[in-house]
């Protein structure tokens, strides 16, 4: 409630020319007689952020009626709590001692003193009184000089204090005083501040602090996951930045909520994302990287060839060497490049390291090799092929592919050659737009190709593969010895054919090859109009109703053209079946289809993606390869740029390669590759079982003589005649850590080798055979007494010394080797599991 008008106001106005007699204590307001307290309080309330709900003193028109004399009334208690003292310094008209000491004080709860009531009888001039509401708006010329000076001095003393209080409230410096009940004086009146608003401000500050803490925690967690550590400052200057950070936090949270569709299907976590980010960021030192890898040794295993000195290949990493990039997956090209220093023809070998994929490819160019003599060309071929197929200590090739550009120029056009020399040879060709296959002759297929050929592609179905070493069962093809002789004229192909000098097979005839060569023709990927497609399944008749409603039919209701995809999805070349299936190397020759057009430059025929051999298992897992399927159906998805980038982020290395006309290419084992035919091409390809891949199985052996007989099994002609009587011996083995992976891959049966039988025994008596020590990669066994009869095989006794690490594999092997009767499932695969460099030393009793 507002207090009643007090006669003190009239006392303050009674002395118009008074001077200030005393100074109030620090913090008190000095008022002139011309300035009623009601007007001052009204002015104060407007300037102070409107804290008080209502004014305590001088409300309404009390300032204007201050000159009216009213008897003092008992004041009501203040609405804001405890009473506070009022103090005035009235101005006197003359410097008399009574007027100089006329300052008085009284509390809000006491009556007016008698001395004050006596002074109330003095008349008040009307011209000196100004309405309180217009006092602050009066011009200075209307006031007396003394009053104007006093008002200006009073205003000057009041403004700095208001500014200080506003600054305290703004910066929060006066919060503690306000919360503790400290009051501010106004017009000589004690006016406490509202507590509920102070509490609200304190709560808002606490909430802001908690929000900042939460933001810091969230940002720190996000940056720790991203490998960044950044401390945010809490100063007031960075408040506008917090809005941007809030948006970033929301974006990151939204990205986390979104899951990749492929990850939702597989529900497999990323295995390499965090480790690759950490190491690729350069946070690990070179020493830590070596310890983490555990792969990089001082010596690098080199290819063992006839003309290569392996002693010169022991390249060690210098201790003070600095590598600009350290990664768990990246190969250090410096080590591989040092291997070229000891090569005879290193200036003719070009190594391409692809920065996007991280894998390396070896190139050689026939125009640079033209000055070599035939003997030098043979040495270069062995050196180049040995470098392409060389492997590290993990049996993974250093390079994903080796290419000799233009090396097949001496060969004739394959399609022209076979259509002219073997016109009636049957072939199988596909029909464009259909999955049907029709059988035709080589000359008829060549005629279709020639009729539809234009600028690098033809519009006829592709020709399926035919065998060049004889057809078996449902295969198509024949034996073409003259063409095979032309292939052997190349030093690169002579050593890498299935029966070549680097092969572990010793074939009596080229017809016995189960690894090719094969030949096929592809038209190239293209868009084909529907009208040009024979018997197109997309073509349909329009009914009468459709003809009437043509205006409503969209133009895309019928396909105008169709994409013919000429692609071979990702696969790895394998030999063998079942548990004996294992990866092997591949060789290919490309001859573009020209049909009389001979361009000056070789045409691009294939786009190839090859993955590094060391990432074989990861590629199989990521791309869901079924390695027991044929090459065309091992993978169900096509690897495009987006998939390549995803795999690269997970540390998988690859190379993107373009193959040209007349190129010969070599692909090491465990290299997953996919091909896309970009122009019409005739291809040759075959598998090669290198001695390098089976060199650890070659040991010197003593043979036991057996009786020979004839065999009706045509598939075993590689090994020679077989009979029903066999004597099988299990060799004594020493453990080799290099082939421990074969134990886990169930390749135990590959170590049982089958050889031709020397003689046939007529007696049915058991024969005791003493077998010396031999080295394989399975386990330690002593074959002491082996009993054999004409129709079955019996093992008398075994003494097995097992290592605890290979106990399970030995048990499985014993069950497979000792069933009482030994059945040979695939003799061709067994023969391929070893090399026969010295036939006498390699004979095994089977």
Curated annotation (Swiss-Prot):
Its cofactor is Fe(2+). Binds 1 Fe(2+) ion per subunit. Residues 66-108, 145-155 have a biased composition (Low complexity). The modification N6-acetyllysine is found at residue 28. Keywords: Acetylation, Dioxygenase, Iron, Isopeptide bond, Metal-binding, Nucleus, Oxidoreductase, Phosphoprotein, Ubl conjugation. The keyword Membrane does not apply. GO terms for molecular function: dioxygenase activity; metal ion binding. Its main location: nucleus. Residues 112-122, 700-718 have a biased composition (Polar residues). There is a cross-link at residues 223, 548, 753, 763, 814 (Glycyl lysine isopeptide (Lys-Gly) (interchain with G-Cter in SUMO2)). 2-oxoglutarate binds at residues 568, 665. InterPro entries: RSBN1/Dpy-21. The modification Phosphoserine is found at residues 6, 32, 315. Belongs to the round spermatid basic protein 1 family. Lysine-specific demethylase that specifically demethylates methylated lysine residues of proteins. PANTHER family: LYSINE-SPECIFIC DEMETHYLASE RSBN1L, ROUND SPERMATID BASIC PROTEIN 1. This is Lysine-specific demethylase RSBN1L. It comes from Homo sapiens (Human).
């Amino acid at each position: 409630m507002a207090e009643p008008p007090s006669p003190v106001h009239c006392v303050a106005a009674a002395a118009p020319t008074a001077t200030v007699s005393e100074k109030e204590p620090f913090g008190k307001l000095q008022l002139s007689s011309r300035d009623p307290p009601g007007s001052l309080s009204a002015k104060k309330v407007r300037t102070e952020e409107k804290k008080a709900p209502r004014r305590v003193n001088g409300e309404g028109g009390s300032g204007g009626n201050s000159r009216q004399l009213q008897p003092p009334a008992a004041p009501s208690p203040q609405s804001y709590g405890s009473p506070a003292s009022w103090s005035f310094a009235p101005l006197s008209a003359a410097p008399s001692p009574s007027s100089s000491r006329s300052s008085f004080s009284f509390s809000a709860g006491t009556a007016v003193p008698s001395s004050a009531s006596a002074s109330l009888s003095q008349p008040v001039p009307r011209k000196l009184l100004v309405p309180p509401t217009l006092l602050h708006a009066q011009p200075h010329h209307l006031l007396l000089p003394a009053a104007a000076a006093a008002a200006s001095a009073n205003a000057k003393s009041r403004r700095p204090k208001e500014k200080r209080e506003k600054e305290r409230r703004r910066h929060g410096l006066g919060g503690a005083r306000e919360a503790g009940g400290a009051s501010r004086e106004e017009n000589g009146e004690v006016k406490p501040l509202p507590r509920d608003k102070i509490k609200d401000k304190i709560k808002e500050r606490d909430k802001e602090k908690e929000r900042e803490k939460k933001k810091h925690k969230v940002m720190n967690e996000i940056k720790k996951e991203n490998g960044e550590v950044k401390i945010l400052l809490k100063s007031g200057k960075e408040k506008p930045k917090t809005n941007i950070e809030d948006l970033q936090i929301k974006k990151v949270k939204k990205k986390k909520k979104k899951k990749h569709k492929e990850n939702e299907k597989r529900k497999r976590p990323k295995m390499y994302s965090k480790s690759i980010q950490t190491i690729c960021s350069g946070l690990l030192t070179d020493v830590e990287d070596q310890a983490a890898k555990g792969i990089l040794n001082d010596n690098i295993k080199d290819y063992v060839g006839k003309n290569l000195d392996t002693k010169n290949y022991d390249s060690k990493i210098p201790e003070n060497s600095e590598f600009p990039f350290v990664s768990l997956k990246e190969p250090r090209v410096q080590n591989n490049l040092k291997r070229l220093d000891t090569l005879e023809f290193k200036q003719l070998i070009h190594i391409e390291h692809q920065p996007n994929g991280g894998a390396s490819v070896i190139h050689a160019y026939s125009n640079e090799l033209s000055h070599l003599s035939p003997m030098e060309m043979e040495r270069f071929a062995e050196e180049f092929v040995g470098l392409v197929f060389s492997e590290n200590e993990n049996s993974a090739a250093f390079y994903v592919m080796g290419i000799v550009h233009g090396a097949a120029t001496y060969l004739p056009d394959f399609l022209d050659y076979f259509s002219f020399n073997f016109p009636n040879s049957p072939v199988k060709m596909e029909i464009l737009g259909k999955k049907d296959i029709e059988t035709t002759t080589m000359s008829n297929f060549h005629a279709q190709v020639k009729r539809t050929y234009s600028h690098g592609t033809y519009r006829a179905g592709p020709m399926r593969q035919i065998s060049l070493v004889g057809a078996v069962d449902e295969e198509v093809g024949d034996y073409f010895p003259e063409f095979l002789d032309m292939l052997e004229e190349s030093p690169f192909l002579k050593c890498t054919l299935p029966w070549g000098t680097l092969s572990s097979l010793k074939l009596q005839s080229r017809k016995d090859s189960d690894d090719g060569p094969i030949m096929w023709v592809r038209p190239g990927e293209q868009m084909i109009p529907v009208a040009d497609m024979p018997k197109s399944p997309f073509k349909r008749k329009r009914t009468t109703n459709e003809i009437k409603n043509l205006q409503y039919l969209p133009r895309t209701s019928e396909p105008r053209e169709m994409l013919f995809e000429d692609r071979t999805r990702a696969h790895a070349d394998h030999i063998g079946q079942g548990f004996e299936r294992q990866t092997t190397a591949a060789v290919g020759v490309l001859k573009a289809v020209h049909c009389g057009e001979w361009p000056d430059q070789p045409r691009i025929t294939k786009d190839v993606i090859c993955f590094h051999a060391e990432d074989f298992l990861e590629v199989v897992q990521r791309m869901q390869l079924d390695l027991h399927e044929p090459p065309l159906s091992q993978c169900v998805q096509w690897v495009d740029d987006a998939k390549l980038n995803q795999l690269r982020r997970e540390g998988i290395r690859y190379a993107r390669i373009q193959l040209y006309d007349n190129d010969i290419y070599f692909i090491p084992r465990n290299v997953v590759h996919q091909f896309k035919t970009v122009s019409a091409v005739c291809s040759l390809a075959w598998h090669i079982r290198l001695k390098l891949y089976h060199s650890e199985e070659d040991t010197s052996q003593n043979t036991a003589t057996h009786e020979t007989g004839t065999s009706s099994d045509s598939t075993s002609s590689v090994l020679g005649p077989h009979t029903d009587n066999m004597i099988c011996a299990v060799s004594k083995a020493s453990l080799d850590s290099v082939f421990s992976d074969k134990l886990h891959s169930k390749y135990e049966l590959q170590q049982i080798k089958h050889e031709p039988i020397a003689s046939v025994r007529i007696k049915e008596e058991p024969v005791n055979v003493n077998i010396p020590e031999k080295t394989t990669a399975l386990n330690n066994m002593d074959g002491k007494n082996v009993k054999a009869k004409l129709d079955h095989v019996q093992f008398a006794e075994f003494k097995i010394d097992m290592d605890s690490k290979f106990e399970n594999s030995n048990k499985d092997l014993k069950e497979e080797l000792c069933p009482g009767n030994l059945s040979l499932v695939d003799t061709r695969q067994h023969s391929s599991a070893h090399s026969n460099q010295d036939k006498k030393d390699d004979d095994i009793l089977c």
